[in-house]
Design a protein with these regions (language model features):
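N-terminal active-site segment of His-dependent metallophosphoesterases
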Residues: 1-51, 121-129, 223
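Binuclear metal-dependent phosphoesterase catalytic core
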Residues: 2-5, 11, 70-71, 83-87, ...
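Conserved catalytic scaffold of divalent metal-dependent phosphoesterases
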Residues: 10-19, 63-151, 197, 220
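A generic local structural motif
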Residues: 19-25, 42-46, 77-79, 118-121, ...
């Protein structure tokens, strides 16, 4: 059986002028799934839904407090605090960033974020693991910032160690902050992507491979 790829558009933090202003439909052609890592205007996400049949899955950023008064983006799917499955792809969503003040919503201490991740263990185990970790903030020590607001979460590293997802997609740390920040790197078997503004990548659409991943996950846990 011939294997095909799924084309994913990851977006975060900064609305892309290329998508916002000009020939949006053509630029979204061929995109199968859109993942938003947060801090994007509600109207921007809703605008994109008008030009693509691809579902838009999102987590909250620390500047998305307006969603609580204006409502969540219409036509999009919030995957915060759940393990959401799209065509066999198991996505764990954990939005927000490190707490750095008392004003903005979607800010968490390390302890609070770890508690959120722990609450998703049952969902993840029931589904035989996760394939993609979708967050707003980066992982601690993995291309995160040195200031309090942009420090990463250590528990994200633990999630990568435990579940070994194929991909970890985050935002929050703008690439313009440091010219040395990589767009893509890796940690173990996980490809780590900084989705600031926009980034397109492909993953295998292989139900057979996902079945094998689930089998390996359960073999790992049964051996403990």
């Amino acid at each position: 059986m011939e294997h095909t790829n799924v084309k994913i558009l990851a977006i975060s933090d900064v609305p892309s002028k290329a998508l916002w202003d000009y020939d949006t439909r053509a630029r979204l052609e061929g995109i199968d799934l859109i993942l938003s890592c947060g801090d994007l205007p509600k109207k921007y996400l809703e605008y994109l839904t008008n030009f693509t049949a691809a579902p838009i899955l999102y987590v909250h950023g620390n500047h998305d407090g307006s969603y609580q008064t204006e409502g969540e983006p219409g036509g999009c799917i919030c995957v915060d605090d759940q393990v959401y499955t799209w065509k066999g792809l198991r996505i764990m969503g954990l939005g927000g960033c490190q707490r750095y003040n008392k004003e903005d919503t979607y800010q968490y201490t390390e302890k609070a974020m770890r508690r959120r991740a722990h609450k998703l263990e049952h969902q993840a185990h029931k589904k035989g693991g996760i394939d993609l970790l979708l967050t707003h903030a980066p992982a601690a020590g993995l291309n995160d910032g040195t200031d309090r607001a942009h420090k990463g979460f250590a528990c994200f590293n633990d999630l990568m160690d435990e579940y070994e997802p194929g991909w970890f997609v985050h935002g929050h740390v703008h690439l313009c902050y440091d010219a040395k920040l990589p767009r893509v790197c890796s940690r173990g078997n996980t490809t780590v992507i900084n989705a600031t503004e926009r980034y397109v990548f492909e993953i295998p659409d292989r139900q057979q491979d996902m079945t094998q991943q689930r089998r390996c996950f359960w073999q790992k846990w049964l051996a403990i």
